[in-house]
């Protein structure tokens, strides 16, 4: 299914099941099919599941002028209103988590039941005071290092075949061109959402990976200390960056417990 944003971008989305809504948001270069191991589980638990391809991703329209994460944040807001979603849970992976951080910052009055952010530091640029950013990038080096990317292995032990079978047809039909989307990645990297998390009054679970190639999971403990009433942290062992795929059973158990606690 598709809907058009206020600036004419067509967003491809799917709605599964009925019940309390859970919105799943993929990361940079991702596809909504990455959530295939969560969708069935959530439907069985009695939730309505909403997935979508962010602009410039998957089956959604390419925006050649995209150089900011803010349109992606607005897309989420418009999709929720278009579908008349009432008090959803938002679950985001990587840049999808940053879209949620931005949503919390821009739409403070939008009623949410809770948030799960998967392996995404709220500040990606490292400083002496904040050594919890993306790898070793700093304000001086981030453009060069993000452009090169290098031979970084995102996962610890690869992606399960049942996920690959869902992703590969989408990648063939709708290839993601990293070079064309570097302006978006650069803007994503420059953002600092720490103050947003410090001030939120919505239950927020930060899920980190002990073997993430990108982030030191200690960032989540630091953020939890700034807002212990509303921020919690779960670390998953034997996983790289794509936790919900690499350790689906562990992640789904964490997710299920969190959703039940905050319904």
Task: Map each language-model feature to its residues.
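N-terminal cap/lid segment of alpha/beta-hydrolase-fold proteins
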Residues: 1-10
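Conserved HGGG/HGGXW glycine-rich cap/lid loop of the alpha/beta-hydrolase fold
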Residues: 9-61
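Flexible "cap/lid" loop of the alpha/beta hydrolase fold
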Residues: 101-105, 112-144
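Conserved alpha/beta-hydrolase catalytic His-Asp/Glu region
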Residues: 127, 132, 143-199
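Catalytic histidine-centered segment of alpha/beta-hydrolase-like enzymes
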Residues: 239-248, 252
């Amino acid at each position: 299914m598709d809907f058009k944003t206020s600036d004419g971008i067509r967003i491809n989305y799917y709605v599964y099941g009925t019940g309390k809504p859970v919105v799943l948001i993929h990361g940079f270069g991702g596809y909504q099919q990455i959530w295939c191991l969560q969708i069935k589980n959530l439907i069985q638990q009695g939730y309505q599941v909403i997935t979508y391809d962010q602009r410039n991703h998957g089956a959604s329209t390419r925006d050649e002028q995209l150089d900011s994460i803010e349109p992606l944040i607005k897309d989420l807001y418009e999709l929720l209103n278009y579908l008349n979603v009432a008090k959803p849970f938002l679950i985001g992976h990587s840049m999808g988590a940053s879209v949620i951080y931005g949503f919390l910052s821009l739409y403070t009055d939008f009623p949410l039941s809770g948030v799960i952010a998967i392996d995404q530091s709220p500040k990606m640029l490292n400083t002496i005071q904040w050594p919890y950013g993306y790898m070793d990038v700093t304000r001086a080096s981030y453009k060069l290092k993000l452009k090169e990317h290098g031979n970084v292995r995102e996962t610890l032990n690869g992606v399960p075949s049942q996920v690959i079978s869902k992703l590969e047809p989408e990648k063939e039909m709708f290839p993601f061109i990293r070079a064309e989307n570097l302006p978006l990645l650069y803007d994503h990297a420059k953002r600092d959402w720490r103050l947003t998390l410090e001030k939120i009054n919505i239950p927020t679970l930060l899920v980190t990976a002990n073997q993430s190639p990108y982030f030191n999971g200690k960032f989540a403990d630091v953020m939890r200390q700034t807002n212990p009433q509303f921020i919690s942290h779960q670390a998953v062992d034997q996983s790289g960056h794509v936790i919900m795929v690499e350790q689906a059973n562990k992640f789904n158990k964490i997710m299920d417990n969190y959703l039940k606690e905050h319904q």
